[in-house]
Amino acid sequence: MKRSLQALYCQLLSFLLTLALTKALVLAVHEPSPRESLQTLPSGSPPGTMVTAPHSPTRLSSVLTLNPTPDGPSSQAAATLETTVSHPEGHPPTDTTSTVMGTAAVPHPESPLPTGSPPAAMTTTPSHSESLPPGDATPTTTLPTKPAGTTSRPTVAPRATTRRPPRPPGSSRKGAGGSTRTLTPVPGGHLARKESQRGRNQSSAHLGPKRPLGKIFQIYKGNFTGSAEPDPSALTPRTPLGGYFSSTQPQTVSPATAPRSTSRVPPTTSLVPVKDKPGFIRSNQGSGPILTSPGGEPAATAATGAPASTQPAPVPSQSPHGDVQDSASHSDSWLAVTPDTDRPTSASSGVFTAATGPTQAAFDATVSAPSPGIPQGPSATPQAPTRPSGVSESTVSPAEEEAEASPTTTDRGPRPLSTVLSTATGNFLNRLVPAGTWKPGTVANISHVAEGDKPQHRATICLSKMDIAWVIVAISVPISSCSVLLTVCCMRRKKKTANPENNLSYWNNAITMDYFNRHAVELPREIQSLETSEDQLSEPRSPANGDYRDTGMVLVNPFCQETLFVGNDQVSEI
């Protein structure tokens, strides 16, 4: 009975231990890992709108809108990228910056250069304030301008994201309340910068604290959304820009245009929309005109691409690199897109290409992210190509363009190369979606957007039911077997006690002593006295019928020593 109870007790302990280990394993396996979710816009959204929800509380989400609208002899297409930040506390932190949006526009070779503002202007959203030498240029996010009177369609973005209506040429950025401050085009660049700075300081008061007035644009913190469309008389071979580039330091992107003279790019100064000036030179056969001010300072760059007969194919792009630890901190994106015609597609980390039928428009974006430990300086920033006024695009050789289009990755922070290569080759080059297949209210052709950031997550353990069962068996069987063996060994040791009855010699000695104690042995012995010794010797006689009373013989018991009775009439008896 005791043995069975002990065995049951050991088995119960082993079962409880196995159950506890199984629960811990199941909780570790089924722990919810961060995943990216897709949201479907309502039916009232414009066609070609895609919204990607953030996969972490402080990660940025990308909203890409593709609106191809043919218009007469000229056609326009806008690729607007909106970035939003969602936070679980309800208010964004003060160290998060997100501003990425832009389009690329090119007029027909037959159409004249627009007299209003150029198709695209350059702006920046830095996170650090530094000074800029007068001769330096900054490649930044391309913000297209739009003529007055044109409206943009609203786009539903996740969590308190507002769509900014487009602004007319020379106007400042509009605030959330819809107030517009229109500025008259000024020939002088200094006055235009001052007016633009004043307008942007007033319109960006609701988005974050004001910075010193010495800079052209404010740093927009928290949720930021921008919408812009190019000039209706321009064709836009477009591609969705990079969603976001997360890093603890500002990132700069050099445009892929071949320079005659280059200058360093500090990560601060912004450029304002440039008015029509006599110093602008345009080339019909080049890959893109460079708009410069008469003083020699580059003010804007108009990106050009394929002719009007080409139907561009959008390539949904995402961040080719990004650390999970760095995603919750600063996120500054400086991006410049420059399409080149008749260029073969190339697969490289940081270079995204899109084939558009007979003509290939390659939008090359090169990213350079300084490491957190290196201070921001001229040595940590890439070279940005600039061009003096009066230089035509057609004079640039293709070899220089190819050399300049290569990605500049100096002082890049530590990031896995496999993530960059797999993201660039698997999701940006091999998944070319036609522009006309995106419909409102559906999530078709955008399932691969959530796959781009999967390598950034931590490695999760995926076990099936059979795997869990095998793990349980492998843990429980050794424990139960060991418990049974220990129980049996302990019970056998308790049985082996010292018992003399098991010895055979003990019983032999006991039997012998008992026999001699119960059965006496009589040994006859003759004792003669001194008086009758001679008579007995002369006349020996034996008692008749064993009567030794009248004789001088003495019976001696061998077991009783030192007992002698000497006499004729005394006989010792047993």
UniProtKB/Swiss-Prot annotation:
Region (Interaction with SH3GL2): 31-169
PTM remark: Glycosylated.
Polar residues composition bias: residue spans: 58-86, 245-271, 316-332
Pfam families: TMEM108
Membrane topology listed for this record: Multi-pass membrane protein
GO process annotations (BP): cellular response to brain-derived neurotrophic factor stimulus; dendrite extension; dentate gyrus development; modulation of excitatory postsynaptic potential; neuron projection development; positive regulation of neurotrophin TRK receptor signaling pathway; postsynaptic density organization; receptor-mediated endocytosis
Disruption phenotype: Mutants are viable and show no difference in body weight or locomotor activity. They are impaired in sensorimotor gating, spatial recognition memory and suppressed fear memory consolidation. Spine density of dentate gyrus granule neurons is significantly reduced compare to wild-type animals, which is associated with decreased spine width and increased spine length.
Region (Interaction with CYFIP2): 489-574
Keyword annotations: Cell projection, Endosome, Glycoprotein, Membrane, Synapse, Transmembrane, Transmembrane helix
Segments traversing the membrane: 9-29, 468-488
Region (Disordered): 32-352, 364-417
Biased composition (Low complexity): 132-160, 292-312
Region (Interaction with DST (isoform 1)): 173-406
Classification via InterPro entries: TMEM108
Tissues in which the UniProt entry reports expression: Expressed in the nervous system tissues, such as hippocampus and spinal cord, is barely detectable in peripheral tissues such as heart, lung, liver, kidney and muscle. In brain, highly expressed in dentate gyrus neurons and expressed in cortex, olfactory bulb, ammon's horn, cerebellum, hypothalamus and striatum.
GO cellular component terms listed in the entry, alphabetical order: axon; axon cytoplasm; dendrite; early endosome; endosome membrane; glutamatergic synapse; postsynaptic density; postsynaptic density membrane
Cellular compartments annotated: Membrane; Postsynaptic density; Endosome membrane; Cell projection, Axon
Oligomer and partners: Interacts with DST (isoform 1). Interacts with SH3GL2. Interacts (via N-terminus) with CYFIP1 and CYFIP2; the interactions associate TMEM108 with the WAVE1 complex.
PANTHER family registered for this protein in UniProt: TRANSMEMBRANE PROTEIN 108
Role noted for this protein: Transmembrane protein required for proper cognitive functions. Involved in the development of dentate gyrus (DG) neuron circuitry, is necessary for AMPA receptors surface expression and proper excitatory postsynaptic currents of DG granule neurons. Regulates the organization and stability of the microtubule network of sensory neurons to allow axonal transport. Through the interaction with DST, mediates the docking of the dynein/dynactin motor complex to vesicle cargos for retrograde axonal transport. In hippocampal neurons, required for BDNF-dependent dendrite outgrowth.
Protein known as: Transmembrane protein 108
Organism of origin: Mus musculus
